[in-house]
């Protein structure tokens, strides 16, 4: 993937850039793996906003991704196409298995049309192959990692992300997360070799607010410019600094997002660096 920069023909085009989509080999998805996707605008079943800054955006169809890959062990698959997915930053690869089934997976860096991938404990260590962590050598970069055996991939699924397998001890493997956190995971959990492709996604300059609206992202307004009825930081005569430590619109202190009493915290060897108090 490469980034194509626009010429400054309009204010919205000045500095803006876009992916060249050179790796895409097909523009229409596999019909049997597409499901309807209804936008909810960040509302719950009662119509109340539960996630702010969402709404609008282009209509999308959901591509069913195989995050498990645990029921095709020993069955080789050929990469038929590399496709665009509007629901994620990574590209997706359409696999044609030898038994005739078709499935999508997240496309790792270096995977191209015509390559052959496989899954299972005896698979080779090459990008796109899926194995249990106990069968992957230390130091290998992996993505699409499970947190629980058989639970499906949960970690390192976005464009350019990867996790390094540091080592294995007894029934746990130590992983260095993209955030720098070191975490232990059951060695029976599966992971896909390689890092996620489309790493240049992070370098795209969107150029104008309208492109964010096309993606379904609404404006994020600072609490300090609101009225007191709308936010704890609102109000005041003229410009003010808020007058208190940063809080959410509901008065909760900003930052501390992790549950200190979570049972899985004991599996975290070293926390990510946040600039805030750890363990909160």
From Swiss-Prot:
Gene3D superfamilies assigned to the protein according to its UniProt record, in alphabetical order: 2.30.30.30, Nucleic acid-binding proteins (2.40.50.140), Ribosomal protein L2, domain 3 (4.10.950.10)
Keyword RNA-binding part of the UniProt annotation: yes
Gene Ontology process terms (BP): cytoplasmic translation
Presence of keyword Membrane: no
Assigned keywords, A-Z: Ribonucleoprotein, Ribosomal protein, RNA-binding, rRNA-binding
HAMAP family on file: Ribosomal_uL2_B
Organism: Mycobacterium ulcerans (strain Agy99)
Function: One of the primary rRNA binding proteins. Required for association of the 30S and 50S subunits to form the 70S ribosome, for tRNA binding and peptide bond formation. It has been suggested to have peptidyltransferase activity; this is somewhat controversial. Makes several contacts with the 16S rRNA in the 70S ribosome.
Record-linked NCBIfam families: rplB_bact
PROSITE patterns on file: RIBOSOMAL_L2
Name of the protein described by the UniProt record: Large ribosomal subunit protein uL2
Organism ancestry: Bacteria, Bacillati, Actinomycetota, Actinomycetes, Mycobacteriales
Oligomer status and interactors: Part of the 50S ribosomal subunit. Forms a bridge to the 30S subunit in the 70S ribosome.
GO function terms (MF aspect): rRNA binding; structural constituent of ribosome; transferase activity
